[in-house]
């Protein structure tokens, strides 16, 4: 379905292997925005292996304006047992600050919604930090709702290893 060009010259396209440095830059910029730069473990090597290797675990779309990458979205498919359909999960979306308010994020979200429909997904979902009010308002303007009855849980690092070794 993509690439797609808008009247304003914005192009959405699927990322390819040569875009790995761009993807890593977006990940680092997002981490800085979210005050989590110290948490980034991604490298060009890990991105190559996990996004463009033998088993790609996720996909990336890039938004380009005047041949410059200004936004990205990384997503993958999950599955809902209740609706018995795949879902589309948006792991990250980020638009560089100088390009916000121009409809770039909205166009990426519309594209992902259309992709979810084309793939017969039962839902399109993502997480957002509670302090990130600008993003929460943006998502609500698209028709998204917060899932107040749900809490995100995670096991990682040493606890993940400990849990696995206890099997």
Residue ranges and their predicted role:
Residues 106, 118, 130-149:
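Conserved active-site alpha-helix within GNAT-family acetyltransferase domains
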Residues 126-135, 154-157:
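Conserved beta-strand-loop-alpha-helix junction that forms the acyl-donor binding cleft
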Residues 51-62:
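A short helix-loop-beta-strand connector motif used in the catalytic cores of GNAT acetyltransferases and
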Residues 95, 101-114, 141:
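Conserved acetyl-CoA-binding loop-helix of GNAT-fold acetyltransferases
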Residues 117-127:
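Conserved GNAT acetyl-CoA-binding A-motif
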Residues 24-50:
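Conserved GNAT-fold acetyl-CoA-binding loop/helix
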Residues 11-23:
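A short beta-loop-alpha structural element at the N-terminal edge
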Residues 62, 68-77:
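Conserved beta-strand in the GNAT
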């Amino acid at each position: 379905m993509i690439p797609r060009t808008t009247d304003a010259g914005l192009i959405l396209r699927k990322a390819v292997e040569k875009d790995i440095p761009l993807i890593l830059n977006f990940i680092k910029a997002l981490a800085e925005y979210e005050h989590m730069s110290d948490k980034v473990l991604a490298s060009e090597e890990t991105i190559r292996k996990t996004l463009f290797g033998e088993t790609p675990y996720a996909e990336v779309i890039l938004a380009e304006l005047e041949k410059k990458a200004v936004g990205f979205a990384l997503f993958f498919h999950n599955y809902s047992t209740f609706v018995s359909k795949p879902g589309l999960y948006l792991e990250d979306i980020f638009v560089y600050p100088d390009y916000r308010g121009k409809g770039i994020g909205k166009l990426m979200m519309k594209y992902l919604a259309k992709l979810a429909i084309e793939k017969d997904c039962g839902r399109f979902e993502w997480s957002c930090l509670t302090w990130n009010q600008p993003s929460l308002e943006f998502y609500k303007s698209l028709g998204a709702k917060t899932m107040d009855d749900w809490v995100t849980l995670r096991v990682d690092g040493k606890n993940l290893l400990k849990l696995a070794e206890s099997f």
